[in-house]
């Protein structure tokens, strides 16, 4: 009998994507993050669905409904803690996934890369609107500060901000629409992730060496299903450790106070995964300039394929580029730290220097390093 998984219209797609998929034999653990992101998305959709059954998107009851979930709903505390910390795990995997793509030159699969950048932006938007929903102090003021950035757009800015708010400030209408956005966006992310995979399977996976792996491929199952399962166990271990032992470690204490438009918290800051972009935004003493820098800090990923000057795809055998890559990593960690600090010296100047270095590394130093490595590899006789 002909194998059903190879003939059935639906099973055939799954078979070509996850079972009989020819995969390079040398891809390392850095290639696990795609599947981990898929798992994170499923966890977030499921926990979010059950939270939405008990949540009310009204300014008067939103905060108390979240408290009710944690106190009165069966395992509601667990759902909330998994959902909140699941977002942190999602972004951790995202940053490592993007970093892997930059290090090994995966961005040369341009369609896959561009869809990936759109996915990153969509996930960031989802996390932002989701953070507003508990309607704590930091939820409210975070929403106020970030949506206010729209007003920096010349001519149409104020109209745009008020249109976004559904009034003259962040209020009931804003909360209701943010809940609607937060519910629909994960499904858009799922659709985009499928397109991301579709483009990836047009070319096949890249590999650490950066050379064409067609001569040496193995089936995805059982080799990489078992390898992904190990990554999954580690992900769940970290998520459960966070959610069960220290659920509020990555949150902000201000969010335990209900939103109060008359009382501004001393330090308005977003969740840790936005701090690098927030630091870049704050490092420019001009509203519009800051907004443009904020956008550029993410959208710069779209032009990385155009800035590839090296003759080799991967950084595996390029020590100068490797050094710059790790400087970039350290720089992003520095920006994340600065984003969580108050706006005072020496943090202001450190943030400005780190922001300048971020753009300098990506736009100038890394392309130059590629050219230099090409020159060094040329035979000199």
UniProtKB/Swiss-Prot annotation:
Co-factor binding comment: Binds 2 heme b groups non-covalently.
Gene Ontology annotations for the cellular component aspect, listed alphabetically: mitochondrial inner membrane; respiratory chain complex III
CDD domains named in the record: cytochrome_b_C, Cytochrome_b_N
Transport in keyword set: yes
Binding-site list for heme b b562: 83, 182
Positions contributing to heme b b566 binding: 97, 196
Subcellular location: Mitochondrion inner membrane
Assembly information from the UniProt record: The cytochrome bc1 complex contains 11 subunits: 3 respiratory subunits (MT-CYB, CYC1 and UQCRFS1), 2 core proteins (UQCRC1 and UQCRC2) and 6 low-molecular weight proteins (UQCRH/QCR6, UQCRB/QCR7, UQCRQ/QCR8, UQCR10/QCR9, UQCR11/QCR10 and a cleavage product of UQCRFS1). This cytochrome bc1 complex then forms a dimer.
Family to which the UniProt record says this protein belongs: Belongs to the cytochrome b family.
Protein name, per record: Cytochrome b
Source organism of the structure: Neophascogale lorentzii
């Amino acid at each position: 009998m002909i194998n059903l998984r190879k003939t059935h219209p639906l099973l055939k797609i799954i078979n070509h994507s996850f079972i009989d998929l020819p995969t390079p034999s040398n891809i390392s653990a850095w290639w696990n993050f795609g599947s981990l992101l898929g798992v994170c998305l499923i966890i977030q959709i499921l926990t979010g669905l059950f939270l939405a059954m008990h949540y009310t998107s009204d300014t008067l009851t939103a905060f108390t409904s979240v408290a009710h979930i944690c106190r009165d709903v069966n395992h509601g505390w667990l759902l909330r803690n998994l959902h909140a910390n699941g977002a942190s795990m999602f972004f951790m995997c995202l940053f490592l996934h993007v970093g892997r793509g930059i290090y090994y030159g995966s961005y040369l699969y341009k369609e896959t890369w561009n869809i990936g950048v759109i996915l990153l932006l969509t996930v960031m938007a989802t996390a932002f609107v989701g953070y507003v929903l508990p309607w704590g102090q930091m939820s409210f003021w975070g929403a106020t500060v970030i949506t206010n950035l729209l007003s920096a757009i010349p001519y149409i800015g104020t109209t745009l901000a008020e249109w976004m708010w559904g009034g003259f400030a962040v209020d009931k209408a804003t909360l209701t629409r943010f809940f609607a956005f937060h519910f629909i966006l994960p499904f858009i992310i799922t659709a985009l992730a499928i397109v991301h995979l579709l483009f990836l399977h047009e070319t096949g996976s890249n590999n650490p060496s950066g050379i064409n792996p067609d001569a040496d491929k193995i089936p995805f199952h059982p080799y990489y299903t078992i390898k992904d399962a190990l990554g999954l166990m580690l992900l769940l271990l970290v998520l459960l450790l966070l959610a069960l032992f220290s659920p509020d470690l990555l949150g902000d204490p201000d969010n335990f106070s209900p939103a109060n438009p008359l009382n501004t918290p001393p330090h308005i800051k977003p969740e840790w995964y936005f701090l690098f972009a927030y630091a870049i935004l704050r490092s420019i003493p001009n509203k519009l300039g800051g907004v443009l820098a904020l956008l550029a800090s993410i959208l710069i990923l779209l032009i990385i394929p155009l800035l590839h000057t090296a003759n080799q795809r991967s950084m595996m055998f390029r020590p100068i580029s490797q050094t710059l890559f790790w400087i970039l990593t350290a720089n992003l960690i520095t920006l994340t730290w600065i984003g969580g600090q108050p706006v005072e010296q020496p943090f202001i100047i450190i943030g400005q220097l780190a922001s300048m270095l971020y753009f300098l590394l990506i736009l100038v130093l890394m392309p130059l390093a590629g050219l230099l490595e090409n020159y060094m590899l040329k035979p000199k006789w």
